Amino acid sequence: MAQEVENNNNDHLVQSSDPEHPANLIPELCRKFYNWGWVTGTGGGTSIRRGDHIFIAPSGVQKELIQPHNIFVLEFPTPKYPPSDRKYIRKPLELKPSACTPLFLTAFERGAGCCIHTHSQWAVLVTLLVEREKGPDACFEISNIEQIKGIPRGKGKGMLGFFDTLKIPIIENTAFEEDLTGSLEKAMDQYPDTYAVLVRRHGIYVWGDDVAKAKTQCESLDYLFQLAVEMHKLGLPWVK
């Protein structure tokens, strides 16, 4: 497989005039996220599953400059570990695969169609506030805010309501991105209805059934995190 990829890099997988094709959507999303301050300094990542293919933004490339020909493509399903067993069917030879890959795969194994990883400052700040106010094992909670309606209750359960309490688990950061995978899987098991996991002092992983849902859920969460930080400054409780 490695020799085949080297000789025939399957460029047709990322060549499409369709703006909704993953190879076109990922660069567009990364530019938006960069402009919103979510993926500065090459940080963060985005991945989309379409059928039995997974499209992933590369590592170490400025997110606002990513082009379709920079995109990696994996067969799905594919092993998470070891990295050498992952079934790449398109691998730009001059670039490195995303360190987020096993975490994206974890979301796709649970039925996600898109997974987004950001380094949002608001996400980082709420992880620190939760740790200081409630301890290292607590999750982020907020209620009685209209934007909560933008977050699902769980698979097939509709959306949260104004009076519901949104809960987002928080895991501890690690020295290497891939080492977060076990903690992410554990958080998903403990909170089976969640569509996001915060990483303390790092950022957040958000996934959805498709690209639009993952993006809008990520936007709603970032709004709520920013609001929570401002509420904390004013001494206002997050849960009423």
From Swiss-Prot:
Pathway: Amino-acid biosynthesis; L-methionine biosynthesis via salvage pathway; L-methionine from S-methyl-5-thio-alpha-D-ribose 1-phosphate: step 2/6. Binds 1 zinc ion per subunit. The keyword Amino-acid biosynthesis applies. Its main location: cytoplasm. Its EC number is 4.2.1.109. Gene3D superfamilies: Class II aldolase/adducin N-terminal domain (3.40.225.10). It comes from Neosartorya fischeri (strain ATCC 1020 / DSM 3700 / CBS 544.65 / FGSC A1164 / JCM 1740 / NRRL 181 / WB 181). The active site is at E146. Belongs to the aldolase class II family. MtnB subfamily. GO terms for molecular function: methylthioribulose 1-phosphate dehydratase activity; zinc ion binding. Residues 1-20 are annotated as: Disordered. Catalyzes the dehydration of methylthioribulose-1-phosphate (MTRu-1-P) into 2,3-diketo-5-methylthiopentyl-1-phosphate (DK-MTP-1-P). SMART domains: Aldolase_II. One of its GO terms (biological process) is L-methionine salvage from methylthioadenosine. This is Methylthioribulose-1-phosphate dehydratase. Its cofactor is Zn(2+).
